[in-house]
Every structure is written in C-alpha cells, then in structure tokens.
Amino acid sequence: MYKRQTHAGWQDRDPAAPVTHISYFEADAFASWAGQRLPTEFEWEAIARGQEGQAPAHDPHEGNQLDEAAPPLPHGSSGLFGDCWQFTRSAYLPYPRFQPAEGAVGEYNGKFMSGQFVLRGASCATARGHSRASYRNFFYPHQRWQFTGLRLAKDI
C-alpha cells in the first residue's frame, strides 16, 4: 500500500481517492491501457448537469476547501466536483459559432491558448463560482498540476 507523509507521520493512502498530479498524456495512456477513453468535454458536461446544484458547500472559515463530496448520481457517477479537475479529450478551442465581443482582448488567443486540453470539474482549491458544469478550465498536455486527474468513458 502506498503511504503519504503528513504532519501526523506516515499515513495509508485511500485507494478509492482520485489519482491526481498527472498530465494529459498520462491520463490518456491510462485510459487506453484500461480499454476505455477520456470523455469529450460535451460528454462530461452532460453527465455533470445531473449533479449540478449538489456541489458541496465551501466554508470561508476553512479556506476554500470543499467539506464533503456531492452524492452519486442515479447512474453511479460521483466525484465530478471537488476532487480534482478532470482531463477531457477535447482541445481548448472556441465553441462552434463563437464570436468575440467587440473590443474583447480575445479569450481564445492562439499564442496563449493553443495546444491545451479542456479540464472539467473542480478541486478543493477551486473558487465556488467556477464549480459548475459549464465552466471550462484548460492545461497543457505535457504538464502536471496537483489538481488534475481523470475520468474514464466507455463506448456502449
């Protein structure tokens, strides 16, 4: 069993806890190894809409950490908000028919945004306003972040 060091000494890791601090490439490789795949951002959002509004409350007196996990959905999905940002297989590009507002600096700036993948969900460090099914985060595929993880999808 894996252990982690805490202020109280070495503790067993929770085998049911999400894997975090991984890159897109590692998430995609694991999904392939498991005979599954990463969901598209649209698949992820469709599932998450059933859990939206059930996101755990943030306690401002405890920093910005989530106090508890949202309950599972009827079809069994859980951990969509609060555990970690989950990689999707979708490139971070403008939505179809996106038109920038006049005078906008440009959220989809090719120099800055190119080559990144969409993350969905939220972590314990996510601001409450970003913990929603429609929020799009993004990250470079070769980099790891302590708040990134994965969710698997399977064609049926």
Language-model regions, residue ranges each:
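Short, structured beta-strand segments at or near domain termini in extracellular proteins/domains
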Residues: 145-156
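Active-site loops and adjacent core secondary-structure elements that bind or stabilize anionic groups
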Residues: 1
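Functional-site microenvironments in short loops/helix caps that host divalent-cation chemistry
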Residues: 4-132
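Short proline/glycine-enriched turn/loop segments at secondary-structure junctions
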Residues: 106-111, 137-144
